[in-house]
Amino acid sequence: MSKPAILALEDGSVFHGTAIGADGQTSGEVVFNTAMTGYQEILTDPSYSRQIVTLTYPHIGNTGVNSEDVESSSIAAAGLVIRDLPLLASSFRCEQSLSDYLAQQNVLGIADMHTRRLTRLLRDKGSQNGAILAGPDAEGEDAEARALEAARAFPGLKGMDLAKVVSCAEPYEWSEGEWTLGSGYADVSQGDRPYHVVAYDYGMKRNILRMLAARGCRLTVVPAQTPAEEVLAMNPDGIFLSNGPGDPEPCDYAISAIQAFLETEIPVFGICLGHQLLALASGAQTVKMNHGHHGANHPVQDLDSGRVMITSQNHGFAVEESTLPDNLRAIHRSLFDGTLQGIERTDRPAFSFQGHPEASPGPRDVAPLFDRFVEMMRHRR
């Protein structure tokens, strides 16, 4: 028997649908993602912390869920909004249905939604604070009013430091390589790993670590608030700054650590939130975007070669190109809206990219950035 669910937005919009997953109430910033595949990777991406994700592709859950296609240990998104949940999940890798997976992780979802209407609203008005009520919480004459109250009570992501919330609690080593059919994820612990990389976990996606490990990196992952002196004492060949959720500006601990690294000649590579933090540490500024970039088909141009790459994106903040100091150079730009996508320091071996070269989900056109990072470490030796 189906259960009711309500999605309310801070502007007063109310949507009714069917509850999937857990019962109860959740709130967060409502965003939309245009990727056609990879819903499990999207849900488990820590960058979606405190966000309710609307998937624009109409059929979600067709292939179920498995234990391999995860980017973290649990679902990070605050909620899920979809058009249609198929009754049957069909895949030789399927271990669980999407609805059971959501319920097991105590995450709310709403199906049978007019996602096209919702997406157009978010596109035109910008990302909205919202709330989902599911199951018994969505019943009663005052349900809509309670949903609206919860939506308007959410403080929004501007000024919210979430990197230290989703980060690991203790340092750990990583030795899992890339996935292949029939073999799963490779164990690279016994292989040749000439480069020691210390990776800051601001909300790390696992596929980033896999792609670095596959390129000969011995990885030590450290919590977001690890002081620079502790990292430098590890004598790394390179320092990686991960993706993550929330506003980069409140992350003073990260910015000060990166500034210390930039006083050395150690190569630094940042992705997503790490890109924004590198920019802030170098003197640039960031801005909250209207509705952000969330999808797997975003064209980005390499400003040096002119080459266009299709990229995976997931961010609601961006570096303001007009604020770049003289020691920062723009190297990538979005062909959707012209926003800055990549920077490099002109005086230090440091660069970053706003999108996700590791994909998961999405294309790997930008994966050579990992090779560039490895080459920088090789050149420094």
From Swiss-Prot:
The gene name reads carA
Residue ranges the record marks as coiled coil: none
What HAMAP family does the annotation carry?
A: CPSase_S_chain (MF_01209)
Organism of provenance: Halomonas eurihalina
Q: Where does L-glutamine bind?
A: 47, 244, 246, 273, 276, 314, 316-317
GO molecular function terms noted in the UniProt entry: ATP binding; carbamoyl-phosphate synthase (glutamine-hydrolyzing) activity; glutaminase activity
The name on file for this protein is Carbamoyl phosphate synthase small chain
Q: Which InterPro entries match?
A: Anth_synth/Amidotransfase, CarbamoylP_synth_ssu, CarbamoylP_synth_ssu_N, CarbP_synth_ssu_N_sf, Class_I_gatase-like, CPSase_GATase1, GATASE
Top-level taxon of origin: Bacteria
Q: What is its EC number?
A: 6.3.5.5
Catalysed reaction(s)?
Answer: hydrogencarbonate + L-glutamine + 2 ATP + H2O = carbamoyl phosphate + L-glutamate + 2 ADP + phosphate + 2 H(+)
Regarding protein family, the annotation reads: Belongs to the CarA family.
Residues at the catalytic site: 272 (nucleophile), 356, 358
Q: Domain Glutamine amidotransferase type-1 spans what residues?
A: 196-381
Which major enzyme category is it?
ligase
Description of how the protein assembles with itself and partners: Composed of two chains; the small (or glutamine) chain promotes the hydrolysis of glutamine to ammonia, which is used by the large (or ammonia) chain to synthesize carbamoyl phosphate. Tetramer of heterodimers (alpha,beta)4.
Keywords from the named record: Amino-acid biosynthesis, Arginine biosynthesis, ATP-binding, Glutamine amidotransferase, Ligase, Nucleotide-binding, Pyrimidine biosynthesis
Q: In which pathway does it act?
A: Amino-acid biosynthesis; L-arginine biosynthesis; carbamoyl phosphate from bicarbonate: step 1/1; Pyrimidine metabolism; UMP biosynthesis via de novo pathway; (S)-dihydroorotate from bicarbonate: step 1/3
Q: What are the boundaries of the region CPSase? A: 1-192
